[in-house]
């Protein structure tokens, strides 16, 4: 049984999925077995009914969710991005499952866990990118501050270049330029 699980786990689309597969154990309860087999059959019908469907990304956000339970904690931008990816995947899967012609009632427990919050999803998209950088579009204040910093940076470079032009040529490197 363990070897079979290990083989199936190699096909998981995420580390979290792989861990869940490896944690499965046989059951002697006929009702549990029937329920699980029905769920697997419904999943197969879903995948076979939508040939171009592919598994959506499911980042492991357990750490971020754990942080969110602690008052005053702050997420790193990359964690926020990953939560946005999970929200997007959840919304899209929910739409695909609800829109399936068979209805797939066996997957009702999964559907109940899925979340759709487009406003939050869009807010996250405006706030951070896929590399975990906070974007100017995260807030108007941030955009103004960054624009002022860029302006100040340019002003300092111009001032240093003007000072550089007053230095005698014998002290200046031929390809010299000002960088900060």
Regions found by a protein language model. Give the residues of each.
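Conserved amphipathic alpha-helical "coupling/scaffold" segments
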Residues: 1-149, 162
């Amino acid at each position: 049984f363990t070897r079979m699980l290990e083989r199936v786990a190699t096909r998981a689309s995420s580390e979290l999925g792989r861990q869940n597969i490896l944690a499965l154990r046989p059951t002697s309860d006929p009702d549990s077995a029937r329920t699980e087999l029905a769920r697997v059959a419904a999943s197969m019908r879903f995948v076979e009914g939508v040939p171009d469907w592919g598994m959506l990304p499911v980042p492991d956000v357990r750490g971020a969710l754990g942080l969110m339970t602690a008052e005053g904690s702050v997420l790193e931008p990359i964690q926020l991005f990953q939560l946005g990816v999970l929200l997007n995947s959840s919304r899209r899967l929910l739409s695909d499952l609800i829109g399936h012609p068979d209805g797939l009632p066996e997957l009702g427990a999964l559907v109940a866990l899925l979340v759709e919050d487009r406003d939050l999803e869009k807010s996250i998209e405006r706030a951070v990118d896929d590399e975990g950088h906070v974007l100017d579009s995260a807030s108007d204040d941030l955009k103004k501050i960054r624009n002022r910093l860029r302006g100040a940076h340019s002003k300092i470079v111009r001032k240093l270049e003007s000072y550089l032009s007053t230095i005698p040529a014998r002290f200046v490197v031929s390809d010299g330029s000002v960088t900060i």
